[in-house]
Amino acid sequence: MFGQYEVFVQLALLALIVLAGPAVILLLYLRGADM
């Protein structure tokens, strides 16, 4: 039985993964470009 809190946490984690993916790739690209 899921409450609103659990659903919100799952959506927050999903959004974090979706946003963190490109952010990490961009960070690695910028670090690689500097070096």
From Swiss-Prot:
Compartmental location: Cellular thylakoid membrane
Keyword terms: Membrane, Photosynthesis, Photosystem II, Thylakoid, Transmembrane, Transmembrane helix
GO CC terms in record: photosystem II; plasma membrane-derived thylakoid membrane
Family classification: Belongs to the Psb30/Ycf12 family.
Quaternary context: PSII is composed of 1 copy each of membrane proteins PsbA, PsbB, PsbC, PsbD, PsbE, PsbF, PsbH, PsbI, PsbJ, PsbK, PsbL, PsbM, PsbT, PsbX, PsbY, PsbZ, Psb30/Ycf12, peripheral proteins PsbO, CyanoQ (PsbQ), PsbU, PsbV and a large number of cofactors. It forms dimeric complexes.
Function, in words: A core subunit of photosystem II (PSII), probably helps stabilize the reaction center.
Keyword Thylakoid: yes
Membrane topology listed for this record: Single-pass membrane protein
Keyword Membrane: yes
Transmembrane segment boundaries: 7-27
UniProt-recorded name of the protein: Photosystem II reaction center protein Psb30
Pfam families associated with the record: PSII_Ycf12
UniProt GO BP: photosynthesis
